[in-house]
Amino acid sequence: MQLSPQEKDKLLIFTAFLVAERRKNKGLKLNYPEAVAYISGLILEGAREGKLVAELMSEGQTWLTRDDVMAGVAEMVDEVQVEATFPDGTKLVTIHNPIQ
């Protein structure tokens, strides 16, 4: 299988997202890399589903709460940026203060 560097990055994000999602579903609090991977994965999936950048930026602030993450993680994640492929091209999605 031949993958471009961007495709490898997306595959790595998605793999980390699956680990984070599994841990969240078990009721475990996410650490910093897991929280970022979880949000990033949902951005990529939303883009694939055809959601708009504005929708993802708005929804992104509801995906995780302070109760979902370990102490101090919410303060460490002030924004998450991911290049996602939308039906009309690749766009940078930025979610400010994603953990409320």
Curated annotation (Swiss-Prot):
Q: Where in the cell is it found?
A: Cytoplasm
Which SUPFAM superfamilies does this UniProt record tie to the protein?
Urease, gamma-subunit
What molecular function does GO assign, one term? nickel cation binding
Q: How does it assemble?
A: Heterotrimer of UreA (gamma), UreB (beta) and UreC (alpha) subunits. Three heterotrimers associate to form the active enzyme.
Tell me which NCBIfam families the record gives: PRK13241.1 (NF009712), urease_gam (TIGR00193)
From which domain of life does this come? Bacteria
Q: Which UniProt keywords apply?
A: Cytoplasm, Hydrolase
The UniProt similarity line reads: Belongs to the urease gamma subunit family.
PANTHER family documented for this protein: UREASE
Q: Which Gene3D superfamilies match?
A: Urease, gamma-like subunit
**In what pathway does it function?**
Nitrogen metabolism; urea degradation; CO(2) and NH(3) from urea (urease route): step 1/1
User: Which protein are we looking at?
Assistant: Urease subunit gamma
> Which Pfam families does the record match to this protein?
Urease_gamma (PF00547)
Organism, as annotated: Picosynechococcus sp. (strain ATCC 27264 / PCC 7002 / PR-6) (Agmenellum quadruplicatum)
Might you give the EC number(s) for this enzyme? 3.5.1.5
Query: An example of a Gene Ontology BP annotation on this entry?
Result: urea catabolic process
User: Reaction catalysed by this chain?
Assistant: urea + 2 H2O + H(+) = hydrogencarbonate + 2 NH4(+)
Recorded GO CC terms: cytoplasm
Q: Report the principal subcellular site.
A: cytoplasm
